[in-house]
Each structure stands twice: as C-alpha cells, then as structure tokens.
C-alpha cells in the first residue's frame, strides 16, 4: 500500500506524548527510523550507495501542553522549510472495540486528527491543510469506559437471544447499529466515567514492540523500497 505513495522526499511525524506510555507510539517509531536527509544534504545521494533513494527525515513535535503550539502549526513550518512530497503521521488511537487494543495497525490516506479519539480535538493534519499528502498510521492503545460497557452489552444481547423468553428483547437490541448502541451506553454511564480511558497492563512492552514493527516496516518500504521493484 505504501509503495504506491513513495516519493523522493518523505517526512515522518512521531505524534504523541513520550512521557505517557500509551501515547508514546509515534515518538518511539521516530526513534527507530533510518533517517538519511542529513547525509544526503552533506554528501549527496551516492553516499547511500543507491540512486533509487527516498530522502527520509523525522520529527517528534510533542503535544500542545509541552510546546504551547498546535502540532499542525509546527508541522506546517517544517513542510515549508523542508518541502517533503509525503508526510507519514504515526499516532496512538482510541479503540472502539476492546478486541482491537494493541492488535491492529491502521493505515489511511486521509490524514490524521490528533486527540480526537479522547475528545481533545486539535487541528487536523491533512493534504488540504498541509499541501502535501498525509498518510496516517495508528494503533489503538486505549479504550474508553463506554466502549468496555458496550462490549459487555454485546455479550448480554447474545445471552438474551439464546433465551426463549427474552429472545425478542435481544433481537430488538441487536437491530440498533454499533454507533447507536455506543451513544446509548455513553449517555447511560455515570458522567465521571465519560473521561475515563483504560490501557492494558502490558502497555509498556506492547508499545515498544509495536513501534519497532512499524518502524522496521517503514524502513523496508522507504529505505529499501527497490526490493519491491
């Protein structure tokens, strides 16, 4: 998939807060990337022993609470100065199904909206706002209380459907869409639980392994992309 977007100049954004483990996926990925822009600028592309070269740079812009600036503002400045042809934005996500926690790697070509998964909406980073294509790569590392209750409710509905006396009730509940059931649960739970997010107990090791998996995949696709030719 990424191979179809490959260009001569790419920039990786390690989005997230390095100090908060579930949100440190992006910075960890940036740590393991084989960046080469500085070498190419100093010695030329032949220093990398190949003409089929993608110039790769990486940045960890931090979060607004650390910098006082919108991440999108920082990125726009970087795009203006370095003029990449493609932005790869890696960020942690909030799951809408607990089974997806630390298990799925999502890729989209529609950009990324930092903080939207936890209700902390920041400026979007898309092709329209930055002027270059933005590939979003993310892994769900947290889940909110409403999702946990909703997953439990799914098991409850299944149990109702298996009961002769309560089957009709289960079928009625099953007729609602996943989004409708989620919103229904969100309205029912206690207000103080709406801002509660949960992460698995092994999140430290999971984030390290996932970040290494993503970074190695990007290194192969971007640095050694000629193996796909």
Language model features with spans:
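Conserved active-site and cofactor/substrate-binding residues in soluble primary-metabolism enzymes
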Residues: 24, 28, 70-74, 82, ...
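Gly/Ser/Thr-rich loops at beta-strand to alpha-helix junctions
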Residues: 14-23, 65, 92-97
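Short, small-residue-biased leader/transition segments that mark boundaries at the very start
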Residues: 3-10
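A structural-propensity feature for long, helix-poor, extended segments
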Residues: 49-78
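A structural signal for small-residue-enriched, beta-sheet-centric alpha/beta enzyme cores
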Residues: 59-60, 89-229
């Amino acid at each position: 998939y990424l191979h179809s977007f490959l260009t001569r100049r790419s920039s990786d954004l390690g989005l997230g807060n390095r100090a908060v483990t579930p949100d440190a996926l992006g910075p960890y990925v940036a740590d393991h990337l084989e960046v080469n822009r500085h070498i190419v600028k100093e010695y030329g592309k032949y220093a990398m022993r190949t003409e089929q070269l993608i110039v790769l740079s990486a940045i960890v812009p931090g979060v607004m609470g650390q910098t006082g600036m919108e991440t999108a503002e920082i990125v726009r400045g970087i795009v203006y100065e370095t003029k990449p042809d493609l932005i790869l934005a890696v960020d942690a996500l909030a799951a809408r199904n607990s089974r997806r926690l630390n298990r799925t790697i999502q890729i989209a070509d529609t950009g990324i909206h930092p903080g939207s998964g936890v209700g902390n909406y920041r400026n979007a980073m898309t092709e329209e706002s930055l002027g270059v294509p933005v590939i979003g790569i993310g892994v769900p590392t947290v889940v909110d209380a409403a999702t946990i209750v909703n997953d439990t409710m799914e098991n409850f509905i299944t149990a109702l459907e298996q009961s002769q006396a309560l089957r009709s009730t289960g079928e009625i509940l099953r007729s609602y869409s996943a989004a409708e059931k989620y919103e229904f649960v969100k309205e029912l739970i206690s207000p103080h639980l709406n801002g509660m997010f949960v992460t698995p107990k092994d999140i430290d090791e999971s984030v390290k392994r996932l970040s290494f998996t993503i970074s190695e995949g990007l290194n192969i696709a971007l640095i050694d992309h000629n193996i796909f030719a």
